[in-house]
Amino acid sequence: MTFIEQSRMITNRWVAAILVGMVITIESSYAIKPNRVYSYTPDKLKLTYEEITVNTDDGTSLNVWHLPSEEEGRPIIISQSDAGNMGDWLYLGLYLQAYGLDVWMYDYRGFGHSNDFAIVQDQLFHTEFVTDLDAVAEYVYQKTGKAPALMGLSMGTIIVNEFLRRTNIPIGKVIFDGYVANPKEWIRRLAANGKTVTFPDGYRNRKYRQKEVESLFIVSEKDTYSIISDIPRGKQGKHIKTFDCEHISGFFRFPEEYTTGIVSFIEESF
């Protein structure tokens, strides 16, 4: 049995339980709600992996799971949403690994088994999370010698965009699911639904202007926060894939189509 066949067999065993758990997590988003306890771990799913500690420039230790590909696959770094921890997205990592990508997952400070951090729940994000991605991306680039692809989920799209503004690390491609094009507009939409969210102290809101990085935007058609009209117009190298589902739930509703769409996008033209 090949590596991919083994991985697919494992995913089929766990799919029902993970779908139920993740739908609950997704519904509780729109506030920073980290969880220190992993519901799913690579050991529990019997995955090939290594657990790594990556240190940031400001002295924080981050927990990282590396799910290596069977061959020299393209590295992808997943920046998660604002709730739970990377264990909630391990099923996604498993699928991407099974399809040949070199997967890197990490917890922001205050999430999972990364260092403690004073979380302000009703804040859109913490700028320190961008520092976390700085450290992980630098580690992955130095370790693999390849320009990593980046994937951001909901709040993670903010982290990726803020990172792109300041990094000198070469980036392969970018995948956004639950895209936050304009943080100020995102806060307005949340307020219209009774949720008060603030910016980090000293944060200067600017509508994102994409660097020349080829990007895939995954859009959930029933999402009332991240909508297709938010996607930058006229951007070269822009790809859009839609799913009939709610906010950042495309993978859990359509795992095969979601995964193959990402893998095809990353591997195309490399």
Give the location of each predicted region.
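Short beta-strand/loop motif that positions the catalytic acidic residue
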Residues: K211, F217-V219
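Hydrolase active-site cap/lid region
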Residues: I158-R209
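The serine-hydrolase catalytic nucleophile loop
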Residues: D82-Y95, Y108, S229
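Active-site glycine-rich loops that stabilize anionic/oxyanionic intermediates
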Residues: G73, S79-G84
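Conserved alpha/beta-hydrolase "acid-adjacent" motif
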Residues: T224-D230
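Alpha/beta-hydrolase active-site loop
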Residues: D122-K143
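Conserved alpha/beta-hydrolase
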Residues: Q97-D116
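An N-terminal hydrophobic leader/cap segment in hydrolases
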Residues: I10, M22-N55, T60-L67
